């Protein structure tokens, strides 16, 4: 176990030495962490609007992007007393997430395999190339990267509940499900069906073997109720995100059709390196799955398979194989109807995301195969093949990391100094809807040039008048306007639902997006006006908060009731103590 931890830390050495560096999404996480820390300093623990983003013109990113990763970064920043540069806060946080994912997969694998095998599988899970090299080092997709933490924990909690009927495992299941939905909604969407399939298969297998414990109906109802309530707790995040999805420039998410991301096509190391790399990973995983299935079937024909336990039956082995095969077909672009409108999986964006499932399933299959094949010769042969492949993947990643960091200076972080981070330019999907903005930052900055470093926080858009005074604090504006005619007043914040305006007499005024750049704009008549323009929570935020609170209360009640019922069953099942035994116990 210690050796596996050392290897994993070695793979994180570049991150810990250089900090978070250039990758696809890392700039966003710099920006979001900066904005989140600013919001916390203003007393907001879960902000939705980022008034300091987009060069101080505001962004709704926190309405849509899951909050867990950013909040975890902020926690790490607090633990280090705000002394670490943000690049190292993110790197240390990612390392902690990687270690946690390894530990949780180890716990999951221990249901089937030995300590040594489980430790190696935990290392392989944390250092799997899509997980580590792609999601952290190359893409910087830290929400998706963090989702790897929760997946084995969900399976482990569900499995232990099926084995022991212990309510504490249901509580852990609820926490992990809520965590996954707060971390990465797309990962929850693709992992959810696999979790459901495993639970149903294991539950019916337990019933056939006649295992003691609550009946199948009670067990299934308990797990479904807890899972649904756990999802409801996360409604605080995803209900506003889904409800307001069309209020931002979210069409930018689908500028590239999902069909164009299929693997096993247009392969070229030079012309299409990303798809080629993902295809290599997928091909290796599919080949290993086929090999493990062949070894299992060979042993089964010779009746050299250990008696099946929960999660180690032939049906379970087949299920893991089918899941990997289906993911392979999906990534190849087959069965494309699954990703066509109105399917929610249309929002997956990249078919390569299914590698999240494939890496987990393959390593789980390894643990199961080692559990059911007791012959030392077979185990040795399988271990040799797997170690050879995994060692090759580790070497591949080490070489890729060496190439990435070979000439990179430690003292200068190009991400932190980039104009995108300096001006906190958010991804295009969070631009104001309908604004004629370029997605490339080098084209966007000239468009925003008149407002980038402007001290002007409000101005007259239409009509005759002037702004006498402007006071602005974290997106809350107070203006004094003198108008000779009716005027339209714009503030230096982009429009998004939630802006409200009020004059000195307490009358509410409508806020619109009346300018080409979609700045929040208020119309007032002739005269002198004192206006307060600020954001207030949208009704959907209130509904989401109430649903989340109600779900949490019901979840605690359900867990409490199930715990009480379990203790009552245990007390009834306990044999009565004889008087002599009772006296001795006293």
Named regions from a protein language model:
Residues 451-570:
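Active-site-proximal, structured, solvent-exposed surfaces of multi-pass membrane proteins
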């Amino acid at each position: 176990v210690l050796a596996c931890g050392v290897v994993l830390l070695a793979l994180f050495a570049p991150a810990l030495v250089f900090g978070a560096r250039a990758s696809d999404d890392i700039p966003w996480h710099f920006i979001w962490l900066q904005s989140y820390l600013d919001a916390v300093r203003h007393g907001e623990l879960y902000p939705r609007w980022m008034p300091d983003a987009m060069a101080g013109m505001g962004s709704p990113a926190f309405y849509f992007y899951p909050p867990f990763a950013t909040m975890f970064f902020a926690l790490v920043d607090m633990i280090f007393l705000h002394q670490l540069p943000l690049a190292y806060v993110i790197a240390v946080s990612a390392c902690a997430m990687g270690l946690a994912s390894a530990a949780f997969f180890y716990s999951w694998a221990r249901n089937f395999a030995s300590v040594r095998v489980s430790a190696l599988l935990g290392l392989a899970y944390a250092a799997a190339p899509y997980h580590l090299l792609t999601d952290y080092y190359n893409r910087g997709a830290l929400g998706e990267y963090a989702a790897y933490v929760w997946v084995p924990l969900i399976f482990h909690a569900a499995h232990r509940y099926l084995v022991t009927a212990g309510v504490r495992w249901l509580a852990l299941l609820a926490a992990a499900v809520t965590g996954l939905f707060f971390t990465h909604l797309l990962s929850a969407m693709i992992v959810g069906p696999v979790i459901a399939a495993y639970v149903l298969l294991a539950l019916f297998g337990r019933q056939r073997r006649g295992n003691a414990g609550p009946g199948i109906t009670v067990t299934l109802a308990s797990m479904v109720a807890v899972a649904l309530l756990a999802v409801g707790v996360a409604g605080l995040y995803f209900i506003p995100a889904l409800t307001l999805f069309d209020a931002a420039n979210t069409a930018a998410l689908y500028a590239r059709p999902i069909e164009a991301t299929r693997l096993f096509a247009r392969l070229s190391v030079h012309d299409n390196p990303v798809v080629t790399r993902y295809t290599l990973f997928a091909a290796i995983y599919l080949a290993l799955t086929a090999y493990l299935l062949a070894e299992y079937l060979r042993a089964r024909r010779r009746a050299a398979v250990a008696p099946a336990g929960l999660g180690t039956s032939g049906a379970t082995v087949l299920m893991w194989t089918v899941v990997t095969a289906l993911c392979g077909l999906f990534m190849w672009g087959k069965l494309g109807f699954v990703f066509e409108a109105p399917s929610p999986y249309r929002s997956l964006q990249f078919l390569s995301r299914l590698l999240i499932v494939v890496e987990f399933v393959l390593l789980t299959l390894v643990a199961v195969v080692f559990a059911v094949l007791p012959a030392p010769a077979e185990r040795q042969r399988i271990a040799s093949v797997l170690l050879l492949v995994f060692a090759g993947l580790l070497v591949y990643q080490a070489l890729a990391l060496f190439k990435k960091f070979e000439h990179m200076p430690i003292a200068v972080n190009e991400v932190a100094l980039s104009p995108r981070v300096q001006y906190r330019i958010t991804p295009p999907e969070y631009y104001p809807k309908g604004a004629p903005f370029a997605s490339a930052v080098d084209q966007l900055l000239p468009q925003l040039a008149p407002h980038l470093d402007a001290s002007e926080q409000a101005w007259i858009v239409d009509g005759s008048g002037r702004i006498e005074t402007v006071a602005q604090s974290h997106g809350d504006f107070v203006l004094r306007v003198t108008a000779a005619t009716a005027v339209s007043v714009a503030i230096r914040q982009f429009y998004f639902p939630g802006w409200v305006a009020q004059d000195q007499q307490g009358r509410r005024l409508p806020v619109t997006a009346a300018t080409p750049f979609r700045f929040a704009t208020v119309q007032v008549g002739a005269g002198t006006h004192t206006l307060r323009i600020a954001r207030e929570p949208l009704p959907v935020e209130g509904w989401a908060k109430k649903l989340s609170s109600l779900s949490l209360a019901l979840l605690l009640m359900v867990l409490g009731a199930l715990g009480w019922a379990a203790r009552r069953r245990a007390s009834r099942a306990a044999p009565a103590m004889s008087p002599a035994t009772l006296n001795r116990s006293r």
